[in-house]
Protein backbone atom coordinates (compact mmCIF):
# COMPACT_ATOMS: atom_id res chain seq x y z
CA UNK A 1 0.00 0.00 0.00
CA UNK A 2 1.50 3.31 -1.09
CA UNK A 3 1.07 6.42 0.97
CA UNK A 4 0.44 9.41 -1.24
CA UNK A 5 2.20 12.63 -0.46
CA UNK A 6 1.25 15.95 -1.98
CA UNK A 7 3.67 18.80 -2.45
CA UNK A 8 2.54 22.13 -3.81
CA UNK A 9 4.82 23.25 -6.63
CA UNK A 10 4.72 27.04 -6.82
CA UNK A 11 4.36 28.77 -10.15
CA UNK A 12 7.52 30.61 -11.13
CA UNK A 13 8.11 33.90 -12.84
CA UNK A 14 11.47 35.05 -14.08
CA UNK A 15 11.05 38.76 -14.66
CA UNK A 16 13.96 40.83 -13.41
CA UNK A 17 13.39 43.99 -15.44
CA UNK A 18 13.01 47.29 -13.64
CA UNK A 19 10.84 49.25 -15.96
CA UNK A 20 11.70 52.49 -17.71
CA UNK A 21 9.19 55.33 -17.85
CA UNK A 22 8.36 57.76 -20.63
CA UNK A 23 6.11 60.73 -21.33
CA UNK A 24 2.86 59.21 -22.64
CA UNK A 25 0.64 57.53 -20.03
CA UNK A 26 0.77 53.86 -21.02
CA UNK A 27 -1.28 50.92 -19.79
CA UNK A 28 -0.85 47.23 -20.57
CA UNK A 29 -3.02 44.13 -20.64
CA UNK A 30 -1.27 40.81 -21.32
CA UNK A 31 -3.36 37.77 -22.17
CA UNK A 32 -4.82 35.69 -24.97
CA UNK A 33 -7.51 37.47 -26.96
CA UNK A 34 -10.51 35.77 -25.41
CA UNK A 35 -13.85 37.18 -24.27
CA UNK A 36 -13.00 36.13 -20.70
CA UNK A 37 -9.75 38.14 -20.57
CA UNK A 38 -11.45 41.54 -20.57
CA UNK A 39 -9.90 43.23 -23.60
CA UNK A 40 -13.29 44.60 -24.69
CA UNK A 41 -14.00 45.94 -21.22
CA UNK A 42 -10.67 47.76 -21.25
CA UNK A 43 -11.31 49.14 -24.74
CA UNK A 44 -14.62 50.57 -23.57
CA UNK A 45 -12.85 52.25 -20.65
CA UNK A 46 -10.19 53.68 -22.98
CA UNK A 47 -12.95 55.04 -25.22
CA UNK A 48 -14.45 56.90 -22.23
CA UNK A 49 -11.08 58.38 -21.33
CA UNK A 50 -10.33 59.52 -24.88
CA UNK A 51 -13.84 61.00 -25.18
CA UNK A 52 -12.95 63.24 -22.22
CA UNK A 53 -10.06 64.65 -24.25
CA UNK A 54 -7.32 62.80 -22.37
CA UNK A 55 -4.40 61.05 -24.03
CA UNK A 56 -3.59 57.44 -23.25
CA UNK A 57 -1.75 54.57 -24.92
CA UNK A 58 -2.96 51.02 -24.35
CA UNK A 59 -1.06 47.89 -25.36
CA UNK A 60 -2.97 44.63 -25.73
CA UNK A 61 -0.42 41.82 -25.90
CA UNK A 62 -1.30 38.18 -26.47
CA UNK A 63 -2.11 35.44 -28.98
CA UNK A 64 -5.46 35.38 -30.76
CA UNK A 65 -7.88 32.59 -29.93
CA UNK A 66 -10.67 34.07 -32.03
CA UNK A 67 -11.55 37.31 -30.23
CA UNK A 68 -8.98 39.67 -31.76
CA UNK A 69 -11.02 40.64 -34.88
CA UNK A 70 -13.84 41.90 -32.64
CA UNK A 71 -11.36 44.03 -30.71
CA UNK A 72 -9.79 45.37 -33.91
CA UNK A 73 -13.21 46.33 -35.26
CA UNK A 74 -14.07 48.15 -32.03
CA UNK A 75 -10.80 50.07 -32.19
CA UNK A 76 -11.42 51.12 -35.79
CA UNK A 77 -15.11 51.94 -35.32
CA UNK A 78 -14.35 54.19 -32.36
CA UNK A 79 -11.28 55.96 -33.74
CA UNK A 80 -8.89 54.48 -31.19
CA UNK A 81 -6.08 53.58 -33.61
CA UNK A 82 -3.77 56.17 -32.04
CA UNK A 83 -4.58 54.98 -28.53
CA UNK A 84 -4.56 51.19 -28.73
CA UNK A 85 -1.83 48.95 -30.11
CA UNK A 86 -2.34 45.21 -30.55
CA UNK A 87 0.65 42.89 -30.35
CA UNK A 88 -0.58 39.46 -31.37
CA UNK A 89 2.57 37.48 -30.68
CA UNK A 90 5.90 38.21 -29.07
CA UNK A 91 8.56 36.33 -27.16
CA UNK A 92 9.58 39.64 -25.59
CA UNK A 93 6.63 40.33 -23.29
CA UNK A 94 9.05 41.78 -20.75
CA UNK A 95 9.80 44.66 -23.13
CA UNK A 96 6.14 45.69 -22.91
CA UNK A 97 6.27 45.70 -19.13
CA UNK A 98 9.17 48.11 -19.57
CA UNK A 99 6.92 50.43 -21.61
CA UNK A 100 4.01 50.38 -19.18
CA UNK A 101 3.06 52.67 -16.32
CA UNK A 102 0.22 50.40 -15.18
CA UNK A 103 -0.71 46.75 -15.79
CA UNK A 104 -4.33 45.60 -15.87
CA UNK A 105 -5.94 42.22 -15.32
CA UNK A 106 -9.59 42.47 -16.42
CA UNK A 107 -10.42 38.76 -16.50
CA UNK A 108 -13.85 37.31 -15.84
CA UNK A 109 -12.14 34.73 -13.64
CA UNK A 110 -8.52 34.32 -12.60
CA UNK A 111 -6.72 31.60 -10.66
CA UNK A 112 -2.95 31.98 -10.30
CA UNK A 113 -2.64 35.28 -12.17
CA UNK A 114 0.88 35.06 -13.57
CA UNK A 115 0.61 38.49 -15.22
CA UNK A 116 -0.08 40.14 -11.86
CA UNK A 117 3.01 38.55 -10.31
CA UNK A 118 5.18 39.50 -13.29
CA UNK A 119 3.99 43.10 -13.06
CA UNK A 120 4.74 43.22 -9.34
CA UNK A 121 8.23 41.86 -9.93
CA UNK A 122 8.70 44.77 -12.35
CA UNK A 123 7.52 47.17 -9.64
CA UNK A 124 4.43 48.13 -11.65
CA UNK A 125 1.11 49.09 -10.04
CA UNK A 126 -1.87 46.90 -10.88
CA UNK A 127 -5.54 47.42 -11.60
CA UNK A 128 -7.39 44.12 -11.15
CA UNK A 129 -10.98 43.00 -11.57
CA UNK A 130 -12.47 41.88 -8.26
CA UNK A 131 -12.92 38.23 -9.25
CA UNK A 132 -11.25 34.90 -8.58
CA UNK A 133 -7.88 35.12 -6.86
CA UNK A 134 -7.33 38.75 -7.88
CA UNK A 135 -8.35 40.26 -4.51
CA UNK A 136 -5.70 38.05 -2.86
CA UNK A 137 -2.97 39.50 -5.07
CA UNK A 138 -3.14 43.04 -3.72
CA UNK A 139 -4.42 45.17 -0.87
CA UNK A 140 -6.79 47.61 -2.56
CA UNK A 141 -5.45 51.15 -2.40
CA UNK A 142 -2.16 50.04 -0.84
CA UNK A 143 -0.21 48.21 -3.55
CA UNK A 144 -2.78 48.20 -6.36
CA UNK A 145 -6.41 48.94 -7.19
CA UNK A 146 -9.46 46.72 -7.59
CA UNK A 147 -12.53 47.52 -9.67
CA UNK A 148 -15.91 45.84 -9.92
CA UNK A 149 -15.86 43.49 -12.90
CA UNK A 150 -18.15 44.84 -15.63
CA UNK A 151 -18.19 48.40 -14.27
CA UNK A 152 -16.64 50.33 -17.17
CA UNK A 153 -16.99 53.71 -15.47
CA UNK A 154 -15.16 52.50 -12.38
CA UNK A 155 -12.42 50.91 -14.49
CA UNK A 156 -11.91 54.19 -16.37
CA UNK A 157 -11.85 56.05 -13.05
CA UNK A 158 -9.19 53.73 -11.60
CA UNK A 159 -7.08 54.11 -14.74
CA UNK A 160 -7.31 57.89 -14.37
CA UNK A 161 -6.37 57.74 -10.69
CA UNK A 162 -3.10 56.10 -11.70
CA UNK A 163 -2.35 58.79 -14.24
CA UNK A 164 -0.91 60.60 -11.22
CA UNK A 165 2.74 59.56 -11.05
CA UNK A 166 2.87 60.14 -7.29
CA UNK A 167 0.03 57.68 -6.74
CA UNK A 168 1.77 55.12 -8.94
CA UNK A 169 5.00 55.56 -7.00
CA UNK A 170 3.17 55.12 -3.71
CA UNK A 171 1.56 51.86 -4.85
CA UNK A 172 4.82 50.58 -6.34
CA UNK A 173 6.69 51.37 -3.14
CA UNK A 174 4.29 49.13 -1.23
CA UNK A 175 4.89 46.11 -3.46
CA UNK A 176 6.83 43.53 -1.46
CA UNK A 177 9.10 42.31 -4.25
CA UNK A 178 11.21 40.27 -1.82
CA UNK A 179 8.19 38.27 -0.65
CA UNK A 180 7.10 37.78 -4.28
CA UNK A 181 10.54 36.45 -5.20
CA UNK A 182 10.56 34.12 -2.19
CA UNK A 183 7.13 32.73 -3.07
CA UNK A 184 7.33 32.57 -6.87
CA UNK A 185 11.07 32.56 -7.62
CA UNK A 186 12.97 29.63 -9.09
CA UNK A 187 14.65 28.80 -5.77
CA UNK A 188 11.32 28.08 -4.10
CA UNK A 189 10.18 26.00 -7.07
CA UNK A 190 13.42 23.99 -7.04
CA UNK A 191 13.15 23.37 -3.30
CA UNK A 192 9.54 22.16 -3.61
CA UNK A 193 10.42 19.96 -6.58
CA UNK A 194 13.29 18.35 -4.65
CA UNK A 195 10.89 17.70 -1.75
CA UNK A 196 8.51 16.00 -4.17
CA UNK A 197 11.30 13.76 -5.44
CA UNK A 198 12.48 13.02 -1.91
CA UNK A 199 15.89 14.60 -2.47
Give the location of each predicted region.
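Nucleotide-activated donor-binding/catalytic signature segment of Leloir-type glycosyltransferases, i.e.
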Residues: 71-88
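Conserved acidic donor-binding segment of nucleotide-sugar-dependent glycosyltransferases
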Residues: 140-141, 145-152, 160-166
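Glycosyltransferase donor-sugar binding loop
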Residues: 30, 57-70
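A conserved mid-protein helix/loop that constitutes part of the nucleotide-sugar donor-binding site
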Residues: 25, 29-48, 66
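Short hydrophobic beta-strand element within catalytic cores of glycosyltransferases
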Residues: 125-128
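Aromatic "clamp/platform" in nucleotide-sugar-dependent glycosyltransferases that forms part
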Residues: 89, 108
Amino acid sequence: MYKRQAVELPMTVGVDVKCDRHTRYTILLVGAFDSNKGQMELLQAVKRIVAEGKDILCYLVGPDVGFMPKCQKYIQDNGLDNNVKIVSYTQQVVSYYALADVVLVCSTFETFGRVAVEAQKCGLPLILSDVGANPERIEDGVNGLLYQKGNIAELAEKIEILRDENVRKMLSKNIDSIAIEEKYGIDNFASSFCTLLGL
